[in-house]
């Protein structure tokens, strides 16, 4: 054991966001903002899932368990389970539904703070890993009250909090992740009454995104859509020329990303 402190003492600032990855999936050592955005659109299991912004933090658990046996001396017996809870800016109905859907799933999680420190887990390799979490889940107040707006928190339960602390590590970034990361939203390629006409609509709430992406999709139709030879865009409607007998659909987000179509994924 040694009790010295780092020659570069850190004044730890507030955590501002998190990045979820599948267990064992790491951010690359030479990470850049552009690479983070690309990874948000990557094919699974290599995709990353950002959650932000965090406004407040509360710790639950993670306390030393010290007990005596009979009249013997007190002895350390580990740390109690710990959950880190962060308050978001507002209730987000889409994020809430997605987190609930995956609440029984474990993740590796990176955090970043105000000083752009990327916080993670030292797994004895040259590349920082995410902190293993047994579950990540939301808690919401969906509707405003007389004294407060609707609200949402996201909680991260450590798989082994003592192990998390023993292997705590970080790297300094030269950019702010919040300026680059972008979580994806589920959309449908919705068929309209007129033949071969479509819109891009968000699954939850039905918000129409066609105006935002219509021209890009039409310009690269054969590259960004399955079973389509060409397309045009006009007045909020995408008109396609489909391949015979085939159902048109958007390609994977990794393909859309290369054509400048970002932040969406078509679901069945």
Q: What spans do the regions from the language model cover?
A:
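Oligomerization/assembly interface segments of phage tail-like spikes and tubes
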Residues: 64-96, 147-164
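Short, acidic/charged, Gly/Pro-enriched secondary-structure junctions
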Residues: 89-128
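The feature marks long extracellular or luminal low-complexity segments
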Residues: 210-268
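Extended Gly/Ser/Thr-rich low-complexity repeat segments
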Residues: 99-110, 172-177, 247-260
């Amino acid at each position: 054991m040694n009790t010295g402190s780092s020659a570069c003492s850190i004044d730890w600032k507030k955590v501002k966001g998190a990045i979820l990855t599948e267990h064992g999936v790491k951010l690359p050592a030479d990470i850049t903002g552009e690479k983070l955005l690309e990874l948000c659109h990557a094919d699974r299991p290599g995709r990353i899932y950002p959650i932000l912004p965090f406004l407040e933090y509360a710790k639950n658990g993670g306390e030393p368990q010290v007990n005596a046996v009979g009249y013997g001396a007190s002895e350390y017996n580990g740390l109690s389970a710990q959950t880190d809870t962060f308050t978001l800016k507002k209730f987000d109905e889409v994020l809430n539904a997605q987190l609930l859907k995956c609440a029984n799933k474990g993740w590796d999680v990176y955090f970043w703070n105000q000083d752009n420190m990327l916080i993670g887990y030292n797994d004895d390799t040259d590349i920082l890993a995410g902190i293993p979490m047994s579950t990540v889940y939301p808690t919401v107040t969906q509707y405003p009250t007389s004294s407060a707006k609707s609200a949402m928190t996201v909680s991260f339960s450590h798989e082994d909090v003592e192990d998390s602390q023993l292997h705590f590590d970080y790297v300094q970034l030269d950019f702010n992740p919040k300026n680059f990361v972008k979580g994806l939203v589920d959309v449908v390629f919705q068929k309209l009454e007129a033949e071969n006409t479509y819109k891009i609509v968000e699954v939850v709430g039905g918000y129409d995104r066609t105006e935002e992406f219509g021209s890009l999709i039409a310009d690269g139709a054969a590259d960004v859509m399955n079973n389509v030879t060409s397309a045009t865009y006009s007045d909020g409607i995408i008109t396609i020329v489909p391949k015979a007998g085939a159902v048109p659909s958007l390609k994977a987000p990794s393909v859309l990303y290369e054509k400048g179509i970002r932040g969406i994924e078509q679901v069945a």
